[in-house]
């Protein structure tokens, strides 16, 4: 009976003895993965694994007893089995570390998410890839008479402002992102909609293509195009032409910062304001600020008047020949005849900055003097590029009410902080709120500062999204594995979030102000630069005619 039992046991464990390496590897792999199972998996496989473990332990026990306590010699297969068992564990560790990432990717790809789950938050890495796809098109094909074309959205569908009259528009973005493309597109449409277009560009010599776009539209509509260079030595217009004494005084006081200011320094500029009023009442028709400065400089600086500050400002403006022409362009006629004026300014020299502010202030005065009660004034579109160099109190006040006089502004700047960089006679926070409140149409290109990105993200509104929570477990091979179960919770996110605003490529912006915010791609109107477009009309050969007028020096009030 003993021999029969031994024979039965030997036959039972014979497969292991004959193939110790195969069963050793399988045993090591099986033990490793059983130990790696999580609690839920162990419960599911409890019966099967218990059976396998029982059989395995019985086999090994019998083999060990027969080898060490009987004449049956199977030590060599046992050594091979033990080595293979360890090798199986090592192979399992290596396999799990390599296979888990691949399996998780396959599971993620094949998993169909719940249809009730909302969209999640954005990933800036994926956004940059998606938004970098350029959409090429000809904007002229989409322009309509009674609507304003903005550009194509990310679905290649045109975006329009469905109003015949455009409101104030704000364009924000750093240099090189495409602000000029949107402004030139709007300017082109303003001309073909029979509006007067005035562009003031703070870049020296102006933009390379913007004047050409304006000229192209003017040629199409049979309108006059005028190019003005503030830095030129050629006399081009008289800033005081057709201006009343009150208008001249208000213009000089506002641009020269002579009025009351938040810092209280305006109290000490009373004598300068007195001289400004004196100039406004005494300047003769056809006379320029340069002429008046030359004739009355000593009078301003005298001990009786003590208006050296005003004299310095006036002397500075007198050096800008472009706005001191006794005969030249008529701003009144340009507005009345709905013509186009492109002004190339400069930002590096204070006298040119003041000249730009004077010019803009005078344009505002001419717009506001038109009758808007018994007739509807023609529309005037004023585009201000890098308009922080053109800010004055007159402009700030006009932004609130000038739409009633048939005008709208398109202002461009680089960041929200530019709006607080104002002259000393203005409050930066008040001006900031004025611009942000009255410019309901906004176009923002790539944001490079957090303040601007966060503001426009908040302005786009909020949507409900789902935040996903997953559990990560560490396996026996020290490999992290994402659990199959996940939790989804409702949260809020900006419709156009900060990641989108930071990832916008060139020629791509976010459009706000007409329904939901949209991604818009703006392509340029094709033009070729030419010297003829930038030719400046020279009025210096015209005969100077100054209307005689008696000046009463004693009457300075």
Where are the regions that the model predicts?
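Generic hydrophobic alpha-helical membrane-span motif
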Residues: 73-74, 207, 420
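N-terminal short leaders/motifs
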Residues: 142-148, 286-293, 465-469, 475-476
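Conserved ATP-driven motor cores of ASCE-family P-loop NTPases powering translocation/secretion/packaging/pilus
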Residues: 408, 413-514
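Short, flexible active-site loops
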Residues: 55-57, 344, 382, 438
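P-loop NTPase motor domains
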Residues: 2-6, 10-23, 28, 32-40, ...
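Basic- and hydrophobic-enriched, low-structure N-terminal and domain-boundary segments
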Residues: 1-175, 181-186, 511
